[in-house]
Amino acid sequence: MAAVIAKSSVSAAVARPARSSVRPMAALKPAVKAAPVAAPAQANQMMVWTPVNNKMFETFSYLPPLTDEQIAAQVDYIVANGWIPCLEFAEADKAYVSNESAIRFGSVSCLYYDNRYWTMWKLPMFGCRDPMQVLREIVACTKAFPDAYVRLVAFDNQKQVQIMGFLVQRPKTARDFQPANKRSV
């Protein structure tokens, strides 16, 4: 009996794997093709963002100033999404974060919700379904304050957050920014 137990324990230790229809592959193929690798940049092709006279605002600040057609397209997008458009304006000396123009709760400002308050042009346009109404208000605000920054912001009343904001007018006398082609050195 002991010999049978010993023989069965040895055969159990040397058990062969069951036959399977799955065969191991020498090389597995990836599910997704890898993207082609771009050539590494030369050191002379890298640019440095200049911090001098290069102040930015909100969403589209890295682009050249928006044309009237581009502003109209953004207004269409805001209204089509059911967001609430609102115009704000500020004089040049109050447009950026400073000790005079911001309420500081700490030593830093993050540029988005940075406690920098601009003056609201009228009330937010609750229930606005006509993009032309928003464009008429932009024209009226820029005529009333030609030497002020004017921005359009959009609020989502469901999420209760500001969705987007961008400049629709920069004062013609403003010298605190660079044209898009001179922002890097």
From Swiss-Prot:
Signal peptide: none annotated. SUPFAM superfamilies: RuBisCO, small subunit. Residues 1-45 form a transit peptide. Belongs to the RuBisCO small chain family. SMART domains: RuBisCO_small (SM00961). The basic functional RuBisCO is composed of a large chain homodimer in a 'head-to-tail' conformation. In form I RuBisCO this homodimer is arranged in a barrel-like tetramer with the small subunits forming a tetrameric 'cap' on each end of the 'barrel'. GO terms for biological process: photorespiration; reductive pentose-phosphate cycle. This is Ribulose bisphosphate carboxylase small subunit, chloroplastic 1. InterPro entries: RuBisCO_ssu, RuBisCO_ssu_dom, RuBisCO_ssu_sf. RuBisCO catalyzes two reactions: the carboxylation of D-ribulose 1,5-bisphosphate, the primary event in carbon dioxide fixation, as well as the oxidative fragmentation of the pentose substrate. Both reactions occur simultaneously and in competition at the same active site. Although the small subunit is not catalytic it is essential for maximal activity. Keywords: Calvin cycle, Carbon dioxide fixation, Chloroplast, Methylation, Photorespiration, Photosynthesis, Plastid, Transit peptide. The modification N-methylmethionine is found at M46. Heterohexadecamer of 8 large and 8 small subunits.
